[in-house]
């Protein structure tokens, strides 16, 4: 209900997530129906004039994004649009950093086992991913890593603590790591690093922080030699 109410009040951000249930509606929907009635309430004692109540449902695309957002572990934030509804349209910094780290780990394991061919395969995959992350997820002007919306072909502008994942994974260049450190002030608060710089009212946005992400940031800073920043 809270999600539907938000989209009713912020129609510009609805992106077809709310569908009016008219005869012949063909757009895929799911979940329970919601009623909306708009009333003109006069300032006098006269009775309110109300439009006919309309039935709406949230679209199937909204629920696909919602389930993807919950699988991401970052539920709920506005990082991937309102209530994470567009999660399935993004290439996230955190997921790609984790995949890079996995590929590098598999390369090392293959070497330990004496599987040179297998090690080379994982090495090439990791390097290809590193280049794509640098190309699509790095914002040179802001000096931070951002998620990429592959549906709109646009880099997000939502500053999120996942920007520290490339440092933790060791895929950031020295210059990129220095730029992220220079922008620590964007995130830093008396209690540590919040999840984002946007106060949306959701669980994983400002002012809330998450211990796991604090450790990712600290380990990432140490990996690139920024021990003083990690210590504070």
Residue ranges, per PLM feature:
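Extended, charge-enriched helical/coil interaction regions that scaffold DNA-processing
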Residues: 9, 14-17
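Amphipathic, soluble alpha/beta structural segments
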Residues: 86, 199-230
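Extended glycan-interaction surfaces of carbohydrate-active proteins
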Residues: 16-91, 128-209
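Generic, well-ordered alpha-helical scaffold segments in large soluble proteins
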Residues: 6, 10, 102-109, 125, ...
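Tryptophan-centric aromatic hotspots in well-structured domains and transmembrane helices
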Residues: 1-7, 98, 138, 204
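Structural helix-adjacent loops and short alpha-helical linkers that scaffold large soluble proteins
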Residues: 1-4, 14-15, 110-127, 170-182, ...
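Well-ordered alpha-helical segments within folded domains of soluble proteins
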Residues: 1, 92-107, 157-170, 208-223
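C-terminal transactivation domains of fungal Zn(2)-Cys(6)
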Residues: 74-132
